[in-house]
Curated annotation (Swiss-Prot):
Keywords: ATP synthesis, Cell inner membrane, Cell membrane, CF(0), Hydrogen ion transport, Ion transport, Lipid-binding, Membrane, Transmembrane, Transmembrane helix, Transport. Its main location: membrane. This is ATP synthase subunit c 1. One of its GO terms (molecular function) is proton-transporting ATP synthase activity, rotational mechanism.
Length: 88
């Protein structure tokens, strides 16, 4: 396989693993928040506000992974170096 095929595969795996980690993190955060609201309904406003802030921070991971994948796919900072090494 050539360099560009590996770039596409790597970007795809990066997005897959980054999205998987984000989904698991968000699921655990929502689960914990719902358990907290079930135990203490009076604190639901505080719990949900804190959960939303936490979810925004977790979601930033997915955004960073997306940005890095797009840079690897389209800007491709390593293209010239790798093509020189391959060309000899």
């Amino acid at each position: 396989m050539d360099f560009f095929t590996w770039v596409i595969i790597t970007a795809g795996f990066g997005m897959a693993f980054g999205s998987l980690g984000t989904a698991i993190g968000q699921g655990l955060a929502v689960k914990s928040a719902l358990e907290g609201v079930a135990r203490n309904p009076g604190a639901s406003g505080k719990i949900l506000t804190t959960m939303m802030i936490g979810l925004a921070m977790v979601e930033s991971l997915a955004i960073y992974v997306f940005v890095v994948s797009m840079i690897i796919l389209f800007a491709n900072p390593f293209k010239d170096v790798v093509l020189e090494l391959v060309a000899g």
